[in-house]
Amino acid sequence: MFLINGLEQNTLAVNDRATQFGDGCFTTARVVDGRVQLLDTHLARLQSACERLAIPFERWSTLGDEMTSLAQRQQTGVLKVILSRGAGGRGYSGSACDTPTRILSTSAAPAHYARWKEEGATLALSPVPLGRNPYLAGLKHLNRLEQVLIRSHLEQTNADEALVLDSDGWLTECCAANLFWRCGQDVYTPRLDQAGVNGIMRQYIMKRLAPTAYRVVEVNAPLSALAQADEVLICNALMPVVPVQRYAEQQWSARELYRYLAPLCESPD
């Protein structure tokens, strides 16, 4: 179902800047037992994105209530929230927009993640690099053409997910997930100050590992860094964390970090 500006409907104004320019941001949350997992973190992500994009959205309490209400109706599955600058005007200027648009939708949970958790995911290198833009890096904005192309190429392989580099050749993320790899007690994840999305589960994992014996390091690393890894994981808010079993000729069977994180990520609140 769709909830647009508080009303159940599936019609959006054709001059909304979400469709005209991808002028907005979004977040995708996991719903379990009628509750939005990490609700406050999702709201904080949207608020931070709106501030950076200069979208004057102010109805945060209303949005939180709508997310909570839809989750209670959905019980289990996925809740997506989109915020756009709104409708009005023409051209790139958003000065004619005075009311941001909020769109909430629900859907079933992805079924394939259960298999990935049991067997481990397989990765393939994407030929599509991410452009480097420090102003937009980290944001889950509505401009997702890179991911559309990455996904299109991935569907031509037998892999489950894509390893994605930025235009300088640094490991950045997967198509729809963040990346971690472990070498002994050191846990590495790509820096996201130039490209990529700072995912909700990435943030949660880094927070949970901070007081442990594991040392979390954000790095600029080449693809070859994975050859030294004892273990590789991918994560997003829906998975929420999955072990990687193979990339090209490299295979990983260790599950130490995964076994530690899995129960924490399944019930993060």
Which residue stretches match the model-derived regions?
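ATP-grasp fold ATP-binding core
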Residues: V78-L83
